[in-house]
């Protein structure tokens, strides 16, 4: 059976056919996994950051799904992949980031913070599909004193009234990768962040853990847009003084020298 990796929508349909044939061919999932594993990808690289597009982005998505999905078997993991795509993925004409924009964003954050020189290896995949509930997504895996991360940038699901652009979504996701790097965990933030919020007079007592993770990512975004508005400003209601504090905080935890 040929597998179509051109985008996540066709992959969803391909996996649907695979499900129908499973009773006839119990090796079908293994054949799919082998087809994914044997492909050689050709990313655009900027230091430790690799950027994937087209079918390479789809294959990178699948590989990360297998790597980060707890499963007792290959079949269960493939089944979970299909269910996720069936439930969340749709074809869309929403706005999408492109390679030149990603490269430009990375140039800006490198100029500000030497970002790519300081962080772990990160793959960035441009996904030609809409993910329900998400404009982008970040994940990482951790080893002994090591980290490897991935960002998936979908077609825009919601720009929140024109506030967000694909570039600011990328900046937000880079903020998540920063906290992965600093803490070595997906859901733990550096203690310095809570002290920073107290200095600003912010009350986080009723904020959920998930809210705090998003707030940290937005703090990185605010730090960048304090220095440049060319990507837009999703938070015009936040003063430049607060944005300057965000910039100083990020600069301190990720020094330029």
Question: Where in this protein do the model-derived segments appear?
Answer:
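Surface-exposed receptor/substrate recognition regions of extracellular proteins
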Residues: 1
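Charged, low-complexity interaction regions
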Residues: 23-24
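Active-site-flanking segments in enzyme catalytic domains
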Residues: 4-16, 30-34, 42-106, 115-257
